[in-house]
């Protein structure tokens, strides 16, 4: 059953579901406009935006114990992260801030320890920032953008342990403790397997050795060059933090390559990055909230020229250019070779988000950092959050990056139970990628593309978005790689878009890369308050974004054909 009520877990029988039902166009608009009658129906939501039930319960615990008046809170999995949020809120609110940071610890005993090498106990620490009204909006914004949230599995464990400590039996406590220690015991193995899988995916996608000269001398060590974080957004924010670390180190007396003349110079620190192409919304927001951002929203050859003009004429540098390969939701592909050339010429870094392209594209040789959401296709099952940061050892950033990840600036906070689930779900990543590629190609070529210009206004996919995108994509496509599972279809008017969406009998909600087909009116969900502005970059408000799953292709053709028939029956006139 793909009919999921608004605000309910999607699918309905999935524990820790990261998506939720948005079954109709009107419910999507109501959600985007924060209509109380709509928002009030939400039992769960996308975890960075709306705490899932276990996290809601943990918030309630903090509010009851530490709250003042009408406060609410957001919890973090370490004191350091909670403190960073607290300091950010104070920087926004000023000296009048009434937000406060509260910390709760739960100590559990390893009663089953068999050797002295095993820890005798484990301390779980949760740091929550509590605030009311406008300040709480700032807390929520930070929690959403940084992506360093308490996971639902961690929250559930903490809730159960707190309950047991207050009024539980000794036997139940022992069982809970044993469960956590069993997961902690499997944590290192799971994370090592994930890191090894990520490296294998880079060097031998679909089992084929790299043959391109770009890989000459490029080797990855899974223990030194791959880092796991708690979400894809955390991977982006970690990359941004690393750039600031590099800039501060380079311009301080602690520079790794300092000279006497260097120490005499005290240039102003650069906090500007570029975004090349129209990206996932939160990527742009985080760059503007925590620094400065120069936006090249088309991400095409003309923007390459504009970027070069900016670099030649502007008095300020840029730290890096962030790109998506391809972009979400317009599936544009930048010219990575030209961007790499400019980066080398003008001394900036390239950060690539390859969440959408995944195994299909060979992008590491062009990147200094690769940030990926493992929540999406890598995981597939849509029941766990995670992200990764991969370093290019040939980058001039690399020695600073290694120092950053060894310092207190970085904490490995991917919860053990999440790592175990993520490892298990990702074992068939290659096979699922090939199957999703095939389903998407058939669905587009046999059904939707023949309707482009007739029923559909425009289809966005690496093969058809534009000639330039296709050529750029082909230049980095892996030998067995396809074009991905994500496409967007724009309709001529809102009525047609609404008719198609409401009648489409697949799961409908946010996220992508799921094993099941998932659709949403993406531009409204992400940009409803700025439709006119984003339309300048091709983000049509009548776009439906579709992530194609692993269902039987004949079933997919049938349900999409039925939805198209509903649009045809409207008889809209398209000039």
Curated annotation (Swiss-Prot):
UniProt superkingdom: Eukaryota
Observed effect of gene inactivation: Decreases growth during sulfur-limited conditions. Simultaneous knockout of MET17 results in an inability to utilize hydrogen sulfide for methionine metabolism, and toxic accumulation of hydrogen sulfide.
Compartments reported by the entry: Cytoplasm
N6-(pyridoxal phosphate)lysine PTM positions: 376
Cofactors demanded by this protein: pyridoxal 5'-phosphate
InterPro entries named in the record: Cys/Met-Metab_PyrdxlP-dep_enz, PyrdxlP-dep_Trfase, PyrdxlP-dep_Trfase_major, PyrdxlP-dep_Trfase_small, Trans-sulfuration_enzymes
Pfam family for this entry, one: Cys_Met_Meta_PP
Catalytic activity as recorded in UniProt: O-acetyl-L-homoserine + methanethiol = L-methionine + acetate + H(+); O-acetyl-L-homoserine + hydrogen sulfide = L-homocysteine + acetate; O-acetyl-L-serine + hydrogen sulfide = L-cysteine + acetate
First and last residue of the signal peptide: none
Gene Ontology biological process terms in this record: L-homocysteine biosynthetic process; sulfate assimilation; sulfur compound metabolic process; sulfur utilization; transsulfuration
Documented EC number(s): 2.5.1.47, 2.5.1.49
GO molecular function: cystathionine gamma-synthase activity; cysteine synthase activity; O-acetylhomoserine aminocarboxypropyltransferase activity; O-acetylhomoserine sulfhydrylase activity; pyridoxal phosphate binding
Keywords per UniProt: Amino-acid biosynthesis, Cytoplasm, Methionine biosynthesis, Pyridoxal phosphate, Transferase
GO cellular component: cytoplasm
Pathway assignment: Amino-acid biosynthesis; L-methionine biosynthesis via de novo pathway; L-homocysteine from O-acetyl-L-homoserine
Induction description: Induced in sulfur-limiting conditions (at protein level).
Additional comment: Present with 2070 molecules/cell in log phase SD medium.
Family listed: Belongs to the trans-sulfuration enzymes family. MET7 subfamily.
Chain's role: Plays a role in inorganic sulfur assimilation during sulfur-limited conditions; catalyzes the conversion of O-acetyl-L-homoserine (OAH) into homocysteine in the methionine biosynthesis pathway. Also catalyzes the conversion of O-acetylserine (OAS) into cysteine, the last step in the cysteine biosynthesis pathway. However, it seems that in S.cerevisiae cysteine biosynthesis occurs exclusively through the cystathionine pathway and not via direct incorporation of sulfur into OAS.
Protein name listed in UniProt: Homocysteine/cysteine synthase
Organism: Saccharomyces cerevisiae (strain ATCC 204508 / S288c)
């Amino acid at each position: 059953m793909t009919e999921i009520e608004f605000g309910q877990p999607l699918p309905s029988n999935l524990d820790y579901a990261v998506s939720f039902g948005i079954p109709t166009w009107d419910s999507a608009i109501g959600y985007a406009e924060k209509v109380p009658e709509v928002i009030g129906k939400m039992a769960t939501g996308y975890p960075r935006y709306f705490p899932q039930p276990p996290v809601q319960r943990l918030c309630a615990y903090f509010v009851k114990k530490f709250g003042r008046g009408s406060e609410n809170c957001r919890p973090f999995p370490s004191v350091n992260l909670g403190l960073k949020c607290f300091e950010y809120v104070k920087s926004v609110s000023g000296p009048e801030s009434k937000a406060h940071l509260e910390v709760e610890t739960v100590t559990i005993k390893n009663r089953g320890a068999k050797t002295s090498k095993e820890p005798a106990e484990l301390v779980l620490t949760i740091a929550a920032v509590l605030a009311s009204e406008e300040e709480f909006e700032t807390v929520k914004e930070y929690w959403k953008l940084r992506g360093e949230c308490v996971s639902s599995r961690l929250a559930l464990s903490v809730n159960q342990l707190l309950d047991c400590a207050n009024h539980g039996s000794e036997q139940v406590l022992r069982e809970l403790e044993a469960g956590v220690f069993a997961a902690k015991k499997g944590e290192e193995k799971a994370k090592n397997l994930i890191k090894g899988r990520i490296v294998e995916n880079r060097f031998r996608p679909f089992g084929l050795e790299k043959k391109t000269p770009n890989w000459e001398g490029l080797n990855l060590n899974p223990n030194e060059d791959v880092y796991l974080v708690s979400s894809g957004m955390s991977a982006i924010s970690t990359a941004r933090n690393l750039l600031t670390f590099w800039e501060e180190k380079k311009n301080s007396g602690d520079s790794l390559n300092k000279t006497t003349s260097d120490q005499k110079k005290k240039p102003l620190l650069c906090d500007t990055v570029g975004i090349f192409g129209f990206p996932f919304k939160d990527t742009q927001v985080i760059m503007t909230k925590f620094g400065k951002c120069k936006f090249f929203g088309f991400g095409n050859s003309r923007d390459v020229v504009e970027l070069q003009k900016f670099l030649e004429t502007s008095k300020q540098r840029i730290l890096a250019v962030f790109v998506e390969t391809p972009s979400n939701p317009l599936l544009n592909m930048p010219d990575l070779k030209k961007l790499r050339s400019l980066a080398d010429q003008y001394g900036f870094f390239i950060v690539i988000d390859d969440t959408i392209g995944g195994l299909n594209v060979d992008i590491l040789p062009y990147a200094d950092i690769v940030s990926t959401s493992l929540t999406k296709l890598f995981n597939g099952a849509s029941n766990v959050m995670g992200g990764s940061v991969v370093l290019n050892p040939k980058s001039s950033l690399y020695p600073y990056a290694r120092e950053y990840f060894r310092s207190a600036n970085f904490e490995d906070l991917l919860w053990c139970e999440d790592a175990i689930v993520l490892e298990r779900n990702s074992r068939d990543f290659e096979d699922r990628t090939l199957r999703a590629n095939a389903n998407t190609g058939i669905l587009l070529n046999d059904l939707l593309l023949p309707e482009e210009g007739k029923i559909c206004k425009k289809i966005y996919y690496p093969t058809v978005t534009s000639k330039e995108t296709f050529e750029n994509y082909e230049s980095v496509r892996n030998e067995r790689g396809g074009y991905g599972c994500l496409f967007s279809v724009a309709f001529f008017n809102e009525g047609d878009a609404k008719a198609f969406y409401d009648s489409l009998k697949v799961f409908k909600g946010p996220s992508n890369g799921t094993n099941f087909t998932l659709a949403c009116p993406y531009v409204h969900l992400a940009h409803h308050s700025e439709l006119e502005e984003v339309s300048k970059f091709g983000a049509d408000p009548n776009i439906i974004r579709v992530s194609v799953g692993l269902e039987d292709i004949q079933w997919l053709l049938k349900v999409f054909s039925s939805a198209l028939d509903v649009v045809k029956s409207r008889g809209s006139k398209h000039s």
